[in-house]
């Protein structure tokens, strides 16, 4: 590897598995130290395995991103582990089906609490830290989705939350530009992760499909002919965190095999 992130500290939320953990692994391969954040009290098995192979590069911190006090404690612990944060990979999110006429307040509140409130207040806390620390080459990467680019009948709340991520990314980028801090987003398409296994089970129930059928169909519908892999997203994240992207800000990069054109 080229060590594009050598000696940098990357803080990743929603990184107990799937895309978040794949990004952490890719960042460490490029020389970064990673604070891996997830809501589980104990580090998931996959995190522990990665920590054993990179004992000096990975710290696991349990935190609920919907709790602003927990966010403050998380950030303090991360600094104790590895010093000032250079990059935030803001990935924590939840998914649920929300048919427009049947959706209830609880589903609405849950998705917006994690996907919007949590995303914003984690970003705000880390940006304040970056400004105060005067961190050189600092950047934020917010995880959006192709669902934030267009409405979908069965996932209205999720689409709205991810559209909010794109909007906050643009606003934050303009606010932080005078400080030399870049803020970008990534909008994945359909990515083969445990979260998508959950999505598949929800659609199986809603549409009367056998398990795995929704995943099979959406993969075939992608112009490149397959679902994405966490490593596909990780490559984009490393690029955006690196100096190679030093003149890129306020953008949300589609990494979706051609599903969305912009």
Stretches found by the model and what they are:
Residues 99-100, 107-112, 218-219:
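Substrate-binding pocket helix/loop in short-chain dehydrogenase/reductase
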Residues 123, 161, 169:
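Active-site helix of classical SDR
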Residues 177, 182, 248-250:
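Short, small/polar-rich loop/turn modules that mediate ligand/substrate recognition or access, typified
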Residues 128, 174-175, 246:
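Alpha-helical segment proximal to the catalytic Tyr-Lys
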Residues 16-17:
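Conserved glycine-rich cofactor-binding loop
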Residues 145:
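Residue(s) in the substrate-gating loop at a strand-loop-helix junction
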Residues 150, 237-238, 249-262:
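Short C-terminal tail/terminal secondary-structure segment
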């Amino acid at each position: 590897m080229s060590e594009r992130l050598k000696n940098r500290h990357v803080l990743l939320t929603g990184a107990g598995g799937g895309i978040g953990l794949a990004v952490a692994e890719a960042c460490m391969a490029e020389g970064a130290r990673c604070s891996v954040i997830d809501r589980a009290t104990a580090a998931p098995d996959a995190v522990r395995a990665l920590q054993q192979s990179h004992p000096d590069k990975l710290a696991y911190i349990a935190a609920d991103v919907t709790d602003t006090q927990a966010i403050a404690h998380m950030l303090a612990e991360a600094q104790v582990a590895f010093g000032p944060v250079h990059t935030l990979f803001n990935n924590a999110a939840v998914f649920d089906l929300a048919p427009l006429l049947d959706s209830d307040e609880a589903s609405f509140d849950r998705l917006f609490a994690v996907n919007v409130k949590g995303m914003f207040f984690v970003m705000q806390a880390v940006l304040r830290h970056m400004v105060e620390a005067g961190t050189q080459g600092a950047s934020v990467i917010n995880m959006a989705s192709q669902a934030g680019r267009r409405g979908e009948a069965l996932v209205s709340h999720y689409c709205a939350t991810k559209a909010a991520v794109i909007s906050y990314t643009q606003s934050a980028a303009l606010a932080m530009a005078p400080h030399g801090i870049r803020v970008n987003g990534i909008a994945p398409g359909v990515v083969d992760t445990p979260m998508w296994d959950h999505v598949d089970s929800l659609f199986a129930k809603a549409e009367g499909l056998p398990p795995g059928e929704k995943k099979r169909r959406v993969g075939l519908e992608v112009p490149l002919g397959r679902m994405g892999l966490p490593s596909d997203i990780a490559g984009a994240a490393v690029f955006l965190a690196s100096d190679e992207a030093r003149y890129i800000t306020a953008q949300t990069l589609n990494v979706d095999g051609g599903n969305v054109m912009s």
